[in-house]
Each structure stands twice: as C-alpha cells, then as structure tokens.
C-alpha cells in the first residue's frame, strides 16, 4: 500500500515473515500484487543478537507473475564479516523462483530452496484426502486425572493408556501415562469442552509429539490409547491400518517435505494432513514398517517403563554374564536390522518421488539408537539393580 504502481519497496525484516503461518495472508497479498526482484536471507547474527533477518526488493507490478526473482542464502555463516565476504564473492547458494510458485505450498511459505521436482508434488493427493484429525482430549487438571502407568494397578478399568508426546522415538513407544477414564471423569472433561469425539475411541492411529527441538517422529497409536493435544493423532477415514504413511512420514523424504510444510518447532495436524502423498511399492513398504514396529516394540518392552514389561533381560541366562552377552547380541541385531530397513525405506521413497540427488538415503545412527537401543553396560546394570 505504501508503494506506487511500478514502484520498488526495499526492506530488512525478521526472517519469520517468509515462513510463519500467521503471516500467510500477507504473503498471499504480495504474491497477488508484486514480484520479488532480489532477496538476501541473512540468517542469524547479521545485526548482533537478532532472530534472523531477510533483505528484499519487491516491485509493485501484477503483469509479470512468472518473473523469477533471485534468492541468496547467507545463513550458514555466523559473523557479519563472513556474511559480507560470502555475499561479495557471489559464491553463496542462489535460487530462482517466481512468487506465484509459492501458492502451491501450504501457508504460501516462501520456501525458496525447494526444487522444481519437489514443487511438482504439492497441491495434489494430499494426506487429508484419506486421513482425518482425531481432535484431542484435555483433562483441564492433569495433576488429578493423569498418572504414570506404574502408579496404578494394571487391572483397573478406570485408567487407560494416554499419549502425551515425548522424546524423539520412531515407530513405537513413549507409553508412560494413563488417564482417568471413569464416567465421572469423562463428564468433567466434556463439561469443559475437553472430551475427544467418541467415534475415535478404540481405533488404531498415527501419532507424534507436537513439539520437538529435533525432528518429528511418528509412532503407532494402539486402539486402547487416548491422546492429548501434545500428542496429535490422525486416522484413516475408514479407520483401517495404513503403515505406508507411517513409513513415508518417518523417512528422509518425509522429513524433507515436513520441513517445507512446518517452519516451527511444533508440527500440527493441519500441516501433516497437507503432506503430498505418492504411493508406490505399497506392500513392500508395509512389510518393512511392520517389522520396524515389532523391533521397536521389543526394545520398548525390554525396559521397566513399558506397561508390557515382564522380566529384566539380565535374568534370562544361567549367569548374569551370559544373560548380558545374549542381551548385547539381541540389541545389536535389532539396531542393525532397523537401520537397514530405514535406509531401504529412504531409497524407496526417494525413487518414488524422484528426489535423487536432493534427498540422502543415509540413516543417522543416533536416530536409530533412539528407537532401538544398543546394550549399555552401565545403564543396564543400574536398571538391573533398580529392578531387583
């Protein structure tokens, strides 16, 4: 509004302008009325202790929507001197896009690093065509209505499993809590607008932790589990199983798209339902995911924090040394199998989406370790003493 027709607007603002969902309307307005000539993403540190900045030049002209502006990225460098040197050398990463290309992306984010191949998948075959949000349950008094599962008897119908997000862990686990599910408690939740819709009770789903400072990780939700707002959950519209989507979202390709769709530390249901879905080699993927679930469930159930823990693994031998050797071998086998499966899933989805050279199939060992742990003498001895 401050610029005449064919005039230029040159500004430096916080980088959140390019990505935050709350500024979608502003980005759409710019897409409809302007073209971007140049953009320099300065990242953190250009102006001291800032929150990240971008400098840009817009021109108010509506007749050149296909004009491809230039985007420079200086975010990898920290100091002002390094940024200046990199900018003047013109050796920083450079990308070219027209603003109207961003209309295809959820929230119209200016995700300028996205390749043309990735752009092709947005705007069609969204996950929302087959999946729906399950809402959330809110007790309005967690201190009263929630317990860690080992604090209550496992034969009580009053308490049922409750999802509350948790640490990074793929496929299965993070089952710590139970919620009071008595009729009186449910009436209280409902009276405050917190009771989740009964049509979602008793169904398997796909869940994850809403907030993460690392990567999103998706897990199987058992049918008996209810879930809170920090453990968003989606279901197929016919409530059937769909391990293909879990495999896709947990893959490197899944992470590639989610980083475009979600630009904050919180991954909400709407963003996940905007995920572009391409199905290929479905049975092969399903078999791999089923095996991953079994591997990670065995890992989770080997520790006392699991509701299905039966016996400490160091008791399963003639001697403690023999038991530990066997346990160490089992853990190593599970770890290597999960790592192999996850890499194969990455390769399948990279091929399915045509993202060779853009997405890496390699699997980070610390990610596998979070879901299928190696034996660790110090930790396992402490656990054994605690169990005793």
Model-derived regions, located:
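Short secondary-structure junctions and interdomain/linker hinges
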Residues: 37, 125-133, 152-157, 166-170, ...
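DNA target-recognition domains and sequence-specific DNA-contacting regions of bacterial/archaeal
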Residues: 136-223, 232-237, 360-388
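Non-catalytic DNA-recognition/assembly elements of restriction-modification systems
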Residues: 107-115, 119-122, 141-142, 276-388
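Long, contiguous hydrophobic alpha-helical segments, chiefly transmembrane helices and signal peptides
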Residues: 39, 55, 146, 179-181, ...
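N-proximal short alpha-helices
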Residues: 214, 218, 257-258, 318-322, ...
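Signature of N6-adenine DNA methyltransferases within the class I
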Residues: 1-155, 174, 184-194, 203, ...
């Amino acid at each position: 509004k401050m610029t005449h027709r064919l005039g230029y607007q040159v500004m430096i603002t916080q980088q959140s302008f390019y990505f935050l969902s709350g500024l979608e309307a502003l980005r759409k307005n710019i897409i409809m009325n302007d073209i971007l000539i140049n953009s320099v993403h300065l990242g953190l540190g250009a102006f001291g202790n800032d929150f990240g900045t971008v400098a840009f030049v817009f021109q108010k002209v509506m007749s050149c929507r296909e004009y491809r502006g230039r985007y420079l990225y200086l975010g990898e460098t920290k100091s002002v001197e390094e940024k200046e040197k990199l900018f003047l050398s013109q050796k920083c990463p450079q990308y070219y896009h027209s603003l109207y290309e961003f209309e295809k992306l959820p929230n119209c984010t200016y995700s300028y690093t996205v390749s043309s191949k990735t752009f092709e998948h947005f705007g069609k075959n969204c996950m929302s065509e087959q999946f729906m949000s399950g809402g959330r349950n809110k007790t309005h008094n967690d201190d009263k209505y929630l317990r860690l599962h080992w604090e209550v008897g496992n034969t009580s119908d009053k308490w049922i499993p409750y999802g509350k997000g948790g640490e990074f862990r793929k496929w299965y686990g993070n089952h710590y809590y139970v919620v009071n599910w008595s009729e009186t408690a449910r009436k209280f939740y409902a009276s405050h607008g917190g009771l989740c819709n009964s049509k979602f009770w008793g169904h398997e789903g796909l869940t994850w932790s809403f907030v993460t400072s690392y990567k999103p990780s998706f897990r199987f939700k058992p049918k008996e589990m209810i879930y809170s707002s920090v453990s968003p959950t989606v279901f197929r519209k016919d409530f059937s199983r769909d391990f293909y989507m879990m495999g896709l979202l947990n893959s490197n390709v899944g992470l590639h798209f989610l980083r475009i769709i979600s630009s904050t530390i919180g991954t909400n249901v709407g963003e996940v339902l905007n995920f572009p879905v391409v199905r290929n080699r479905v049975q092969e993927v399903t078999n791999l995911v089923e095996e991953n679930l079994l591997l990670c469930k065995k890992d989770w159930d080997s520790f006392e924090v699991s509701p299905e823990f039966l016996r400490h693994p160091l008791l399963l031998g003639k001697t403690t040394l023999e038991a530990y050797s066997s346990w160490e071998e089992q853990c190593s086998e599970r770890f290597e199998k999960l790592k192999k499966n996850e890499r194969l899933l990455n390769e399948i989805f990279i091929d399915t989406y045509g993202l060779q050279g853009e997405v890496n199939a390699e699997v980070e060992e610390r990610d596998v370790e979070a879901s299928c742990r190696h034996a660790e003498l110090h930790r396992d001895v402490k656990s054994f003493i605690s169990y005793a």
